[in-house]
């Protein structure tokens, strides 16, 4: 509930606060309360760490992008002609502007979302030469992240057992749908299937409607985040042991962990969950999105004090002492009646009018914004969450920035998402010592691109 409140307060900037936010936005290095001003030239914490990224789509690339944001060198291995699967997951695509003919219509928005701060090499490991190159890269790297089906890399001698002998200090992270063990371990796992299998879809959607998936692939994203944390922990452990280890991260496990209080409620009571609640809360009322005169607004009368504020701002102070609504338990009991009353009042004014009425009240509230409204939101922009960078083939592109702010470092978009094979020559020459003629020969054999 606290996260909803925090997000609500963030989203509720009204016209009166815009000038303040604008002034803050003009001071990107403003001193934090109680903390020295950021020294933005300090080295990023993962500078000097090299990651061999053998992942594609979303969960694995989310992990490696986080590591890249924090300063690691990410070498992304892609199929020499197809590249990452998401390169073809357009439209929308960012059109090429450099006049070079390519097999793609542009760089897909999907691919652009999770591949900044990486180098791309086009490399096939369907032949011994490609495998040998990957072995050499593994020797030079601190971390390897892959997201292939369990056991499928063994025939290429790229499994953990083989790679750990080549480089015992390497942290090897495997991201799969259902993990390396268990009865479902051989299943392919995409986000939607795991949302369905592991309970999330069942609790998502309107009360009397069929289950729906979450609007963004949260299981993939949370798995990428958990895997990044696992990699950091393994690197920290390596400082004492000198040894890497195998990280087994699965969408299924991370999704179960993400059920949080809902899973805990079932474990504590031994009873079935309470099902889908739409934007409402199973045990707190009023706490949901309601219709206004023009769009929708979310409000949180999450305790007696906040409920009282809501009643007064709605012009209905008598609801505070209504015997049906005196406590949260009673408000939950009479949910349908109270929700209908609240929505009837909210529909008398526009969302913007309510935002101005609720301003400064201390009650959580937020306009329900679409994505265009979000990426152009005054607070999002003031927090530098959207950054425009120069792409080598597409001109300028806006990307979502790294979300965590630090007092002494500044993770940022150092390089845009790479073109397929953009860094093949650089990596082979500078890191592995290949000569120009050797690389040309590998290209002729379609081992590299």
Feature map (PLM): residue ranges:
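N-terminal helix-loop segment corresponding to the beta1-alpha1 unit
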Residues: 2-230, 234-240, 419, 426-449
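Flexible, small-/acidic-enriched active-site or ligand-binding loops
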Residues: 42, 326, 394-441
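Glycine-rich beta-alpha junction loops
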Residues: 81, 178-179, 251-256, 294, ...
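Conserved Rossmann-fold dehydrogenase catalytic segment
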Residues: 180, 208-216, 239-255, 271-282, ...
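A short glycine-threonine-serine/GTX helix/turn-capping micro-motif
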Residues: 211-222, 244-246, 277-287, 296-298, ...
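Oxidoreductase and adenylate-handling cofactor-binding alpha/beta cores
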Residues: 224-245, 257-270, 311-318
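Aromatic-enriched alpha-helical interface/lid elements that frame and gate functional surfaces
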Residues: 285-361, 365
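A glycine-rich dinucleotide-binding beta-alpha-beta segment and adjacent secondary-structure elements
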Residues: 360-414
């Amino acid at each position: 509930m606290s996260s909803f409140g925090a997000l609500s307060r963030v989203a509720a900037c009204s016209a009166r606060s815009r000038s303040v936010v604008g002034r803050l936005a003009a001071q990107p290095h403003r001193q934090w309360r109680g903390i020295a001003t950021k020294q933005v030239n300090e080295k990023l914490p993962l500078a000097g760490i090299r990651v061999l990224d053998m992942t594609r789509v979303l969960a694995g690339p989310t992990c490696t992008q986080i590591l890249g944001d924090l300063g690691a060198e990410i070498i992304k291995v892609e199929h020499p002609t197809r590249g990452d699967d998401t390169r073809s997951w357009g439209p929308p695509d960012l059109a090429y502007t450099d006049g070079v003919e390519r097999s793609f219509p542009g760089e897909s928005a999907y691919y652009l979302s999770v591949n900044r701060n990486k180098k791309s090499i086009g490399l096939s490991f369907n032949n011994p030469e490609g495998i040998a190159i990957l072995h050499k890269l593994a020797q030079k790297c601190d971390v390897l992240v892959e997201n292939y089906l369990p056991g499928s890399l063994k025939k290429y001698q790229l499994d953990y057992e083989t790679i750990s002998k080549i480089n015992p200090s390497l942290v090897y992270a495997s991201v799969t749908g259902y993990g390396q063990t268990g009865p479902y371990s051989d299943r392919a796992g995409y986000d939607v299937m795991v949302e369905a299998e592991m309970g999330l879809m069942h609790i998502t959607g309107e009360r009397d409607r069929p289950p729906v998936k979450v609007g963004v692939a949260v299981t993939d994203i949370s798995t990428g985040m958990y895997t990044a944390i696992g990699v950091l922990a393994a690197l920290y452990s390596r400082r004492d042991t000198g040894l890497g280890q195998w990280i087994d991260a699965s969408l299924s496990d991370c999704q179960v962990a993400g059920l949080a209080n809902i899973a805990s409620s079932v474990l504590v009571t031994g009873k079935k969950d309470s099902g889908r609640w739409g934007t409402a809360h199973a045990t707190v009322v009023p706490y949901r999105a309601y219709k206004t005169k023009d769009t929708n607004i979310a409000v949180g009368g999450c305790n007696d004090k906040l409920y009282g504020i809501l009643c007064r701002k709605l012009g209905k102070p008598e609801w505070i002492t209504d015997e049906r609504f005196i406590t949260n338990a009673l408000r939950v009991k009479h949910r349908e009646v109270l929700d209908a009353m609240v929505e009837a009042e909210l529909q008398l004014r526009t969302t913007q009018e309510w935002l101005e009425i609720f301003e400064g009240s201390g009650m959580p509230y937020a306009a329900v914004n679409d994505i265009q409204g979000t990426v152009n939101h005054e607070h999002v922009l003031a927090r530098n969450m959207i950054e425009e960078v120069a792409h080598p083939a597409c001109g300028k592109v806006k990307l979502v920035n790294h979300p965590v702010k630090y007092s002494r470092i500044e993770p940022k978009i150092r390089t845009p998402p790479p073109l397929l094979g953009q860094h093949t020559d650089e990596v082979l020459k500078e890191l592995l010592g290949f000569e120009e003629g050797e690389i040309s020969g590998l290209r002729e054999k379609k081992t590299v691109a």
